[in-house]
Amino acid sequence: MDPKYIRNFSIVAHIDHGKSTLADRMLEATGAVQKREMRAQLLDDMELERERGITIKARAVTIHHKFDGHEYQLNLIDTPGHVDFNYEVEKSMQACEGAVLLVDSSQGVEAQTVANAYLAIEADLEIIPVLNKTDLPHSRPEEVSEEIENSLALEATDAIRISAKTGENVDQVLDRIVERVPAPGGDPDGTLRALIFDAVYDEYRGVIVYLRVVDGSINKRDRVRMLGTGKVYETIELGRFQPKMLPSDGLRAGEVGYFVSNIKQLGDVRVGDTIVLDKGPEAEMLPGYKEPQHMVFADFYPTNPGDYQGMRDALETLCLSDSSLAFEPVSSDALGFGYRCGFLGLLHMEIIEQRLEREHDMDMIQTAPSVTYQILMKDGTEGWIHSPGALPSPDQYEELREPIARVSMLLPTEYIGPVLQISTDHRGNFVRQEHLSPTRCLLYTSPSPRDRQKSRMPSSA
């Protein structure tokens, strides 16, 4: 397809604002799924996602929409809403030119609305504000539009008002995507360059690589090379997501799809790597991704010592589909051999634990979660401490620095006093306050001056 008729976009929002429901309605409206096959959260195929009603893993799907006499190919990436899975959102945005910013018109702008909007702005995406749940009696679209403008500096007076539950005005969202999201750049006739934005492991087919073709084209039986690892593979199967994997003969510049090459070694695929033709002209590597910053650490020990290697295999498999997970071997006098794992947050840790138990039948003991500390030694060197047992004696180091966070809090005005008190009790320092609407405000806090002097670690918002 001509790239000028392709649009790549994601849906971003705070948790429970209706992302997956809107994706369902888009699939229905474009005829991508037959009514008899339709079910809620169609793209959320992980058991834990359907059980909890949340999106954990980003999903891609290709749909077709007619506008102004032309048929457009829309590549949709449905992303998670919880802060612990922000890395999934960030990866997905690298494969897009636009983002639908979905806001619950009864709840208004919330924490992940702001965080995901900032990610979209940093990725230079065209942002389309959409107000959901306008069919509810307590919906307040005018106020929420004002909140979007005040907190994010985005024009929202013409934000589309929809009900993802009933499908009202979803067709207008599709039209707006075609109108405002730019067509993908790149050279359709140039040398192949494709970005790996995700990968999953299939027991029978091996690693399935998700890619966005930036330049050129990739065809079945092509021999391709990954610039980061230098590995060469033959594309045995490639295709698009509609929403199930549908094989095709090739993918062109601007398209999103997958390929299979009997890749069995999990470490051979790196999210953010660039794919080129093996015998083609030299190509420059595409910008990759920032390494995820692990905020929480915990140790996992198999209850049966014989399962040590099995736990390693399970963690390696999870690492392929979740590149924000990290682990390393660890030992304990009481618990034996296990693995110390790094997570983006407590929910991320809980999800990984449950996936190990359900998908890999692991019976294990988990230690209490902890954070990483930075240590300044007497000789001037710096290091990282992941557990109390790794802390040297006090006469060997000058400073022990704990993580800090600069926090923005969106809340109803009646809770300002109690929230400030809790913040102060936890060593927070009030910075400033902004009123987004008559009923909602934005508070900024940071660590107290004493803590800022103690620590020079990077902050997180």
What residues fall within each predicted segment?
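Structural and coupling elements of P-loop NTPases
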Residues: 1-446, 450-452
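Positively charged, low-complexity/disordered segments
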Residues: 449-451, 455-461
